[in-house]
Amino acid sequence: IARVDECDMSEELKVRTKAEARFFRAFAYLTLTQYFGKVAIVTEELPYDAPTIARNSVEEVRNFILTELAEVAEILPESYSGGFMNEIGRVTRYAALALRSRAALYFGNYEEAEKSAKAVIDSGKYSLFKLTSLNAAQEQEAEEMDLYIDFAELGIDKDKFIKGMFSYEALWQGANATPANPEYVLTHEYMGDPNAYDQYRYTYFIPLSMSIQNGYSSFEPMQDLVDAYWKVDGKTLPEKIQVDARKANYEKIWNYAKNLSEE
């Protein structure tokens, strides 16, 4: 930040570059204060042999983060057109506001969290990523969901549930994991590995013999995580599943998969 003015670039670009750096500094301080609480706020370049700096209070660090993000949000552009130094995916005004909303939420400052989040929402630049149709493999999985969920009994729209589930899954896949995705506010792009494959989904999560991949069924959510989610009515916690009911569910799935392998 201190040496940007020495660079050969336009004044406009210098101002924006400083704002980008301040964004990441605030991001770093957010991580630090979440781990350690009180940390030293350093905004100037220090010599190697500088004396030890006293830590600032938690309140001071939090105010610094929220103030920095609010200020850089007024400097950063809403979007980028592409090209050198204007690459799509760089920090935008709404990335700063989104991070500010998250920080304020962590700090228990709900008024500021709502204010910053509403600014992002009202911009109209972002929306949930939604699939409009399913491929053959997804259709098969959707059919198997009836083994787990009685949609009619729970009053759940199966089509919306299934498309919502697969939309969330597809959100992270390579073809959709780009700055062009309407749900992405800030992205970190990297080179993909052509040898990578979806091992976790087909081995650790899927029950044994549920598919030709022979899952391990070793990654399962703890009950505390399950209970952290609301039921379809948005209010009450789900009832505990009894052992006999769990046993019956597993037998139903096992028999279904066994019949598939015999066919």
Language-model-detected regions and their locations in the chain:
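Alpha-helical scaffold segments in carbohydrate-active enzymes
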Residues: 20-32, 71, 95, 99-106, ...
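An aromatic- and glycine-enriched ligand-binding surface/loop that stacks and positions planar moieties
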Residues: 93-97, 104-263
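Short coil/turn linking the two alpha-helices of tandem helical-hairpin repeats
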Residues: 33-34, 38-40, 80, 103-109
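Solvent-exposed loop/turn segments at secondary-structure junctions
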Residues: 39, 47-48, 191-193
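Glycine- and aromatic-rich loop/turn segments at beta-sheet edges
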Residues: 38-45, 73-86, 127-137
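Aromatic-lined, polymer-binding surfaces characteristic
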Residues: 15, 38-39, 86-94
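Conserved, well-structured interaction surfaces
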Residues: 1-36, 52, 56-60, 69-84
